[in-house]
Regions:
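Sec-type signal peptide cleavage vicinity
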Residues: 2-7, 18-304
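Hydrophobic core
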Residues: 13-17
Length: 304
């Protein structure tokens, strides 16, 4: 029996990441691993970066799982001990490399492949993975670590050709743009003097790697956004619907501006929030969607 290496390709963009990987599901006896075939072929991992804004492309690693079919039937992912279980893909100067060789189960069995990022070194249960966003996202590393990506490719035939799994953003991105009104002198309001926070969002949850479903847990918290310069700030939040709450807080020295708003943050959407402020208060808000997915709804409002 020839042993066929899995040829893995990762495509990273603002909308998706492509990876090939594999995994299994749930409460069944774990299949016996086959003997290693004689012929080995080195894994190839190719990366195409379609958008320079895809921070994940080089800053985080990808984890992958694979599960093979038994008697022609799909097998769910187990909590652990899948055929390919949380193999790490790491970016190097010459492309993505797996921490260990990855093979198809045999020359005929179909396989399902699952992938996620950022990589977690210890996953006790891939059907109930702890995920979340840091409450401090002021650094590029913290921001990249908050962007959870997931994807799968099912019922794959063994092949020496490259296969891909599209990884989608499971969380939402919020871009806040501060616009000073006429009572500010030109250049008076500087990004370095501002801090922006998203309030009342839950930051913890669980991921089912097989389905991509995320469930929230924990109490609402406040997240500090990354300062992009030019009076713009960005933060990653988990998908959730907020009632009428103190949504955005902007701090300019001793002056605090608060926006009260109800909003639904959906997976793989990027929300552009433009907040107008004068020296006394925030006077207005316009919200649109861009970047990952487009939502043309105008959420406009008044901030006090």
């Amino acid at each position: 029996m020839n042993r066929i290496f899995l040829n893995i390709g990762i495509l990273l963009s603002a909308l998706a990441v492509t990876v090939s990987c594999g995994s299994d599901e749930a409460e069944q006896d774990v299949p016996v691993q086959p003997d290693k075939p004689d012929v080995e072929e080195k894994i190839q991992a190719n990366v195409l970066t379609k958008a320079a804004s895809a921070v994940v492309s080089t800053r985080v690693d990808v984890g992958m799982y694979m599960q093979h079919y038994v008697d022609g039937k799909m097998v769910d992912l187990y909590a652990a001990h899948n055929y390919v279980n949380n193999v790490r893909m790491k970016y190097a100067a010459d492309g993505w490399k797996s921490a260990e060789p990855v093979y198809w189960y045999d020359e005929s069995s179909l396989s399902d492949i699952y992938a996620y990022a950022p990589y977690q070194s210890e996953v006790e249960d891939c059907r109930n993975m702890a995920v979340g966003v840091p409450t401090d996202q002021t650094s590029t590393e913290q921001f990249a670590a908050a962007d959870l990506l997931w994807g799968r490719n099912l019922a794959l035939n063994p092949t020496t050709s490259q296969i891909s799994v599209s990884l989608n953003h499971l969380f939402a991105k919020v871009n806040v743009k501060i616009t000073p009104e006429a009572d500010f002198a030109e250049g008076e309001l500087k990004a370095s003097d501002l801090k922006v926070f998203i309030n009342n969002v839950r930051c913890e949850g669980k991921l089912d790697l097989q389905t991509g479903d995320v469930t929230l847990s924990g109490d609402p918290q406040t997240v500090c956004a990354r300062n992009n310069g030019d009076l713009s700030f960005t933060v990653i939040v988990m998908p959730q619907t907020l009632g009428f709450v103190n949504l955005i807080r902007v701090e300019w020295g001793d002056v605090v501006y608060v926006l009260q708003r109800s909003i639904a943050f959906d997976s793989h959407r990027s929300y552009d929030l433009t907040v107008s402020i004068n020296k006394k208060e925030a006077t207005g808000l316009n919200i649109g969607i861009s970047g990952w997915d487009i939502d043309d709804k105008d959420y406009g409002g008044v901030v006090e």
